[in-house]
Amino acid sequence: MLIPRRVKHRKQHHPGRSGQATGGTKVSFGEFGIQALTPAYVTNRQIESARIAMTRHIKRGGKVWINIYPDRPLTKKPAETRMGSGKGSPEWWVANVKPGRVLFEVSGVSEDLAREAMSRAIHKLPLKARIIKREEGDA
């Protein structure tokens, strides 16, 4: 699972989900990518589940890149606890994904295999996404 080794502050404010992604909007490593169309918090478990779904479908053929990292803690108070008494303890680590962000990339496989693997991964994620292809001008 993806978890930060060390953080300066154990609890953080919730990151805003409005607006478009400013960086990481093009396919930069692989040939195909999954691009988010809606904003969402993607947890480390969802990222790992999507990665496993893709790699199992691709088998040994290609390479998968993960372009997001869950670096924000989300807290939760215990069940049946009265309001007040401070902020709850960290429960999950999330990546704040904005529309336009490329989440995963794949290379080394045919387009049909890549599209099928990525559609399986999209079903594991809590957002709407599309599959994009690398353009000639991209670095």
Curated annotation (Swiss-Prot):
State the Pfam families in the record.
Ribosomal_L16 (PF00252)
Q: Where is the composition biased (Basic residues)?
A: 1-16
The keyword Transcription belongs to this UniProt entry's keyword annotation: no
GO BP, sorted A to Z = translation
| Gene3D superfamilies cross-referenced by the UniProt entry | Ribosomal protein L10e/L16 (3.90.1170.10)
Could you tell me which residues belong to the region Disordered? Answer: 1-25
Q: Which InterPro entries match?
A: Ribosomal_uL16 (IPR047873), Ribosomal_uL16_bact-type (IPR000114), Ribosomal_uL16_CS (IPR020798), Ribosomal_uL16_dom (IPR016180), Ribosomal_uL16_sf (IPR036920)
GO CC, one annotated term: cytosolic large ribosomal subunit
Domain of life of the organism in this record?
Bacteria
Which CDD domains has this protein been placed in?
A: Ribosomal_L16_L10e
Please provide, alphabetically and separated by semicolons, the GO molecular function terms listed in this UniProt record: rRNA binding; structural constituent of ribosome; tRNA binding
What are the record keywords, sorted? Ribonucleoprotein, Ribosomal protein, RNA-binding, rRNA-binding, tRNA-binding
Coiled coil (residue ranges): none
Record's signal peptide: none
State what this protein does.
Binds 23S rRNA and is also seen to make contacts with the A and possibly P site tRNAs.
Quaternary structure and partners: Part of the 50S ribosomal subunit.
Q: Which family does it belong to?
A: Belongs to the universal ribosomal protein uL16 family.
Q: Which HAMAP family match?
A: Ribosomal_uL16
Record's PANTHER family? 50S/60S RIBOSOMAL PROTEIN L16, LARGE RIBOSOMAL SUBUNIT PROTEIN UL16M
Name assigned to this protein: Large ribosomal subunit protein uL16
Give the originating organism: Leifsonia xyli subsp. xyli (strain CTCB07)
- Tell me the gene name: rplP
